[in-house]
């Protein structure tokens, strides 16, 4: 009797989980399916010219596959390509810089205890939890004094000094046995050698998962570019997607699919490292 109740309970939980998965996938399926429809069908559906109801507009399955939108985006919309490279040129330096600084800072907080280190790390956590809206004014003042407004440095520098990587990597480094560090010191290794030859190989999966999360976070930033960048041609792709629905809805779905492609590729490539990183960190 008890086993039957457990099976019923597990089945009920699976049904609920499946329901939420389907709900989460509907917007993605909607975007992908409509990216495969022609311009005429898209315009007729979303400009009210077709005479069909709203529910009929939400059809997920395309009537036929048409790559017209992708062709126009990739070969007839140079603005999309330009903003794509803008986004890549902003995000990649942030990921590299933040992860490198995060490794050094995490090592300092976890293996080089000094007076006030716990309080300083607490400030790191507070800064990580602060939303962008809280720091927008002081950030703007500082960046303006440095002459970085309307330059990519206004986005890259604050991103490099973000605290997420430090917080995430510190949790893992604290669990590394001090005996490894002491043995390396006895062999004559300095701190940089310990980090490069010992800790980085041991933290490889955590570092990769951290880099992936930083990439996904900054790939989709919108408020920072709008605030610190005044020239629209310097905007990243994430800002462009916010206006394309009203300006060029006929290619908006294809732009959204292409925008999601790179983060999806990153997640699929490093899926094992990402899940392993979360699992290891949760155990710490």
List each language-model region with its residue ranges:
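A structural signal for multi-pass alpha-helical bundles of membrane permease subunits
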Residues: 2-284
């Amino acid at each position: 009797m008890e086993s039957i109740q457990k099976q019923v309970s597990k089945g009920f939980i699976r049904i609920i989980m499946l329901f939420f998965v389907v709900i989460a996938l509907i917007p993605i399926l909607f975007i992908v399916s409509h990216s495969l429809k022609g311009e005429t069908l898209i315009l007729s559906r979303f400009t009210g010219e077709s005479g069909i109801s709203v529910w009929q507009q939400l059809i997920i399955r395309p009537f036929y596959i048409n790559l017209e939108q992708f062709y126009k985006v990739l070969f007839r919309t140079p603005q999309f390509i330009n903003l794509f490279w803008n986004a890549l040129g902003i995000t990649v330096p942030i990921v590299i810089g933040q992860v490198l600084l995060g490794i050094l800072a995490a090592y300092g907080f976890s293996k080089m205890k000094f007076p006030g280190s716990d309080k300083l790390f607490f400030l790191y956590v507070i800064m990580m939890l602060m939303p962008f809206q809280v720091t927008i004014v002081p950030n703007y003042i500082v960046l303006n004094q440095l002459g970085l407004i309307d330059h990519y440095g206004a986005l890259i520098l604050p991103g490099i000094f973000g605290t997420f990587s430090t917080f995430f990597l510190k949790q893992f480094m604290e669990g590394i046995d001090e005996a490894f560090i002491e043995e390396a010191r006895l062999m004559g290794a300095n701190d940089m050698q310990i980090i490069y030859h010992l800790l980085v190989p041991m933290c490889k999966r955590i570092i990769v998962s951290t880099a992936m999360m930083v990439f996904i976070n900054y790939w989709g930033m919108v408020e920072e570019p709008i605030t610190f960048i005044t020239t629209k041609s310097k905007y990243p792709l994430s800002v462009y997607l916010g206006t394309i629905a009203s300006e060029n809805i006929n290619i908006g779905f294809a732009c959204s699919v292409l925008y999601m492609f790179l983060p999806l590729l990153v997640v699929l490539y490093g899926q094992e490292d990402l899940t392993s990183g979360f699992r290891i960190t949760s155990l710490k």
